[in-house]
Amino acid sequence: MDVTXLLLATLLVFLCCFAAYSHLPPEEKLRDDRSLRSNSSVNLLDLPSVSIVALNKKSKKISRKEAENKRSSKKEASKQKVARPRTPLSVPCVSTRGSCKPPAPACCHPCASCQCRFFRSACSCRVINVNC
């Protein structure tokens, strides 16, 4: 092996290691508490303390009841929003589970939609949302 190729390979490895570790900050070794106090810019005594408060069983029951009330009110609101006037049935329409291939008219049921399978060779009207 040529000496210059060996020297270039060593230099390449050194540069790779230097590039990998150059972004890391140097570690400071603190010898005692005095150097810690002099080096730190923030005084630890000035920071507010953190207090942890345990919840009692009564407060947990109240929050659970409130959550259940919120859930029930949301369900009632969603049921009220769903109720909407249905469109009158048009005479030329396809019944539920009937064939609705693209030249056919729309489905009779207002909540039904035409679903096709096998590259639009088999199409039928199906109700997707039962609570519509």
Curated annotation (Swiss-Prot):
One of its GO terms (cellular component) is extracellular space. Glycans are attached at residue 39. GO terms for molecular function: melanocortin receptor binding; neuropeptide hormone activity. PROSITE patterns: AGOUTI_1 (PS60024), AGOUTI_2 (PS51150). Residues 62-93 are annotated as: Disordered. Residues 1-22 form the signal peptide. Residues 93-132 form the Agouti domain. Keywords: Disulfide bond, Glycoprotein, Knottin, Secreted, Signal. The keyword Signal applies. Disulfide bonds join 93-108, 100-114, 107-125, 111-132, 116-123. It is found in: Secreted. Residues 64-79 have a biased composition (Basic and acidic residues). InterPro entries: Agouti, Agouti_dom, Agouti_dom_sf. GO terms for biological process: hormone-mediated signaling pathway; melanin biosynthetic process; melanosome organization. The presence of a 'disulfide through disulfide knot' structurally defines this protein as a knottin. Involved in the regulation of melanogenesis. The binding of ASP to MC1R precludes alpha-MSH initiated signaling and thus blocks production of cAMP, leading to a down-regulation of eumelanogenesis (brown/black pigment) and thus increasing synthesis of pheomelanin (yellow/red pigment). This is Agouti-signaling protein. It comes from Leontopithecus chrysomelas. The lineage of its organism: Eukaryota, Metazoa, Chordata, Craniata, Vertebrata.
